[in-house]
Amino acid sequence: MSYRPSASFKIQSTDSKIHMKAIVFTKYGTTDVLELKEIDKPIPKEDEVLIKVYAVSINDWDLGLFQGDPINRLLNGLFKPKIKIPGSDIAGRIEAVGNNVKKFQPGDEVYGDLSGRWGGFAEYVCARENALALKPASMSFGEAAAIPQAAMLALQGLRDTGQIQSGQNLLINGAGGGVGTFAVQIARLYGVEVTGVDSSVKLDMMRSMGFDHVIDYKQEDFTKNGKSYDLILDVKTNRSIFDYTRVLSRNGIYAIVGGSLFRLLQALLLGPWISMISKKKICFVALKANKDLDYMNELYETGKVKPVIDRTYRLDEVPEALRFFGEGTHKGKVVITVKHDY
C-alpha cells in the first residue's frame, strides 16, 4: 500500500454552525468539477445512523456519477446532478443513531455500500442500518472500505449467477482490479482452475494472488487460443458477446459484472436469444448490496480472503485518485483515507 501526496484544495466555507468537509460536484464533467467544500454536517433521520467516515474506496460508479455517463444521467438527473457527493463504499465509526435504529449504537465500527444514496467522500455520512455491517476489530478501516461492492460482485457473480462448482475452469476478464482480486480468492475456495486476463503491469500481482494462468490481453487473445471455460466472470465486457460464447464450454455460463454501454446493450439484446438456442447461459450479475458482508467477515477473520489495496489518498486528493483509477492500471482497490482534526 502506497501513499501519493499532492497539492491540497483551498477550502470553500459556507455559513453553517456545524459543518464538515466533503467532495462536491454541481455539474457533470472531468475531475475539474470536483471541489472540496465545507458543507452542513448531516443529521440522521429516525431510521438512520450518522457515521464518522475514516475510509472510502473508489468504484466505477463514482466515475460515471460525476462524469455524467448515460446511465447515471438517467438515474441522477439529465442535465444537473441530484446527488452531489460521490462515494459509496465507506468505513467508519457510528457517532449518533436515530430513535428507530436497533442494530447499532454510537461507537460501533461499521462498513457498507451506500449505492443509491452516496455521500461517502466526506467526513460524515448518514446511512440506514441495513446498509451496514460491523467491522471486525482485526480489519483496518481501509480494508473494510475496499470490500463492499467489489467483494459482493465477486461472490455473488461466482456463487449465485455463475453457479460455480469444484473442478471447473474459470476465466476472469479484468482480473487485476477490485472485483477480480476478490474473485480469485473466493474461486480458490471452490477448487477451480482460474485464468485471469488483464494488462501486463498487473500480471505479477495476479500470480501472487493465486491465478493458475494469466494472460496479457495485448499479447494474447483468449477467445482465439483454443481453450474453453465453464464460467466466465467479465468485469470489462470489452468484446463481442459472440467472442465470449465461442470459448464457453457446453452448459457454460457467461456472468457479466460491468463494461462498456454498447457491449452491455448487445448482451442484453442478444443474450436471451443465445441462451435459448444453445446450452450456454448469458447472465448479468444483479448486485445485492451488503447481503454477504457477514460472510466476508468470516472469510477475512479466517485468513481466506484479504483486500488488495494499491494506493491510498487523502480526501483532498480525490480528483487525483479518480484520475489514477480511471487509467485502469490500479492493482486491486484504491482507497481514500479521511483524517479528522477533532
What are the residue ranges of the model-derived segments?
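A short acidic, Gly/Pro-enriched loop at the edge of an enzyme's catalytic core
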Residues: T223-L231
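Glycine-rich phosphate-binding loop and adjacent beta-alpha segment
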Residues: R239-T302, V338-Y342
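Short glycine-centered segments of the SAM/dcSAM-binding site in methyltransferase folds
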Residues: E109, N169, G252-I253
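NAD(P)H dinucleotide-binding glycine-rich loop of Rossmann-like/cofactor-binding domains
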Residues: F79-K80, S88, A96, K103, ...
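C-terminal hydrophobic helical "lid"/dimerization subdomain
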Residues: K288-Y342
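Mid-domain Rossmann-like dinucleotide-binding core that forms the NAD(H)/NADP(H) cofactor-binding site
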Residues: A145-D216
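Alpha-helical membrane-targeting segments
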Residues: Y3, T14, L63, G68-K84, ...
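Glycine-rich beta-strand-centered segment in the early N-terminal region that forms part
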Residues: D40-S57, I71-G116
